[in-house]
Amino acid sequence: MTDLHPVRRALLSVSDKTGLIELGKSLAERGVELLSTGGTAKALRDAGLTVKDVSEVTGFPEMMDGRVKTLHPMVHGGLLALRDNDAHVAAMTDHGIGEIDLLVVNLYPFEAALKRGAAYDEMIENIDIGGPAMIRAAAKNHAFVNVVVDVEDYGVLLEELDQNDGQTSFAFRQWLAQNAYARTAAYDAAVSNWMAGAIGLDAPRRRAFAGQIAQTLRYGENPHQDAAFYTDGTERVGVATAEQLQGKELSYNNINDTDAAFELVSEFAPEDGPAVAIIKHANPCGVARGATLLEAYNKAFDCDRTSAFGGIVALNMPLDAETAEAITQIFTEVVIAPGASDEAKAIFAAKKNLRLLITEGLPNPQDAGLTTRQVSGGMLVQDKDVGHRAMDDLKVVTEKAPTEEQMADLLFAWKVAKHVKSNAIVYVKDGQTVGVGAGQMSRVDSATIAGVKAQRMADAMELPESLAKGSAVASDAFFPFADGLMEAASNGATCVIQPGGSMRDDEVIKAANDAGLAMVFTGMRHFRH
């Protein structure tokens, strides 16, 4: 095998015709013979290029509505033959098989059909057979054959040919082959996952995942870790599909925290009023509603002014000038919002390092999906936590029932607690978190920390008593003992929302009654690890 190998004959068969004519002309100008199929051949001919149909090469017409056209030894022999193997060369000569040095294929648009919700039969017809077979054949024989599966690589291919006098290097072909195998793997993953859903398999025997590189990151969570950001093709509204209007390149931690912030704030529908979430290390340090976006931001900021420094701000409404001005008064890493006014953009423009992401919408917090986590030797896969509770879903278990105002705060706290690392305790008062206890091994400790935060908030605002007084409390899981509940009561809480389900529920309910608390059960847990 030699390092450099010439490109004299190319087979082009593409669904996406972007850049096809330019590529065909460039190859023809370099003396490359063009083979093609169906609509690709027609497009090239219409552009005035000389093209040989694959059916002329195989001696068989395209048949079965195009299902069979390239699955033939005259094609696969030309892709798979080892040019330095005498037996292979002899077989090619005996059977009149010509070498194919370049394969350009992009596959039937299965993923596009999936996104638009095509019917079952249409999905089946969008499963490419000949394309992946040729891609895998060409990639296997990358010692001699180039395989291009992405439009953005057309220019790279031409540059390689020009740099090597019409030849390509082994390293280049190897790079193309890796990308080709990744493409067919992603394609098959999309097909298998669609089919699992179509037939209702919650836990298929094999599960495939695929991603498309979006960004090579400077480093991971820490500087000694390499990292990259991949999109999964679902196009859920959020950080992966947002447009970055300004600011430094997003880091690994920026992306992780921004996703957490936007998913949280999306729990609050715009029609219910402005809402703002401020996130640090994937935990909320402040979440609030307000009559205006500015009021919501100020209330969220007041929750924990210290932790908000260097945080992520997520809005459920387009950013306006007044809120933009307030945000710029403190160092903020990222702001993510459905939109931004021209005035707000102008204010942010003076802060060159501040990253502004625009999503053009909010995700539906109840949209189904999967979450994954690597463990040693395997992967955990589960349904996304899209559990939702409304007022009618709650069960009052104490002698005292929450008032209408308390119920509103309880539901607010419950939405926030869903996005706090367990064990999670959240104190809320008047549509504003006043204390968040996150990630503690003991639920009592989380309640204590949330109480400390509420007192610090009061001190910072020069208020005479802790903001936990009169607050609503949410716990992401049941209270196994009454101690966590009593800690919240000692801090001044007046009502509680929790899943219930402890073997000591009766003991906890009695403690709530003795303390004069109103308490409701949701029947749903929101662990987050």
UniProtKB/Swiss-Prot annotation:
Name the reaction it catalyses. Answer: (6R)-10-formyltetrahydrofolate + 5-amino-1-(5-phospho-beta-D-ribosyl)imidazole-4-carboxamide = 5-formamido-1-(5-phospho-D-ribosyl)imidazole-4-carboxamide + (6S)-5,6,7,8-tetrahydrofolate; IMP + H2O = 5-formamido-1-(5-phospho-D-ribosyl)imidazole-4-carboxamide
Do you know which PROSITE patterns this protein is assigned to? MGS
Pathway where it operates: Purine metabolism; IMP biosynthesis via de novo pathway; 5-formamido-1-(5-phospho-D-ribosyl)imidazole-4-carboxamide from 5-amino-1-(5-phospho-D-ribosyl)imidazole-4-carboxamide (10-formyl THF route): step 1/1; Purine metabolism; IMP biosynthesis via de novo pathway; IMP from 5-formamido-1-(5-phospho-D-ribosyl)imidazole-4-carboxamide: step 1/1
Q: Which GO terms describe its biological process?
A: 'de novo' IMP biosynthetic process
Which GO terms of the molecular function aspect are on file? IMP cyclohydrolase activity; phosphoribosylaminoimidazolecarboxamide formyltransferase activity
User: For this protein, what is the EC number?
Assistant: 2.1.2.3, 3.5.4.10
So which domain of life are we looking at? Answer: Bacteria
Keywords of the record: Hydrolase, Multifunctional enzyme, Purine biosynthesis, Transferase
Looking up SMART domains in the UniProt record yields: AICARFT_IMPCHas (SM00798), MGS (SM00851)
Xref: Gene3D superfamilies? 3.40.140.20, Methylglyoxal synthase-like domain
CDD domains the UniProt entry points to: IMPCH
Q: Known HAMAP family for this protein? A: PurH (MF_00139)
**Record protein name field:** Bifunctional purine biosynthesis protein PurH
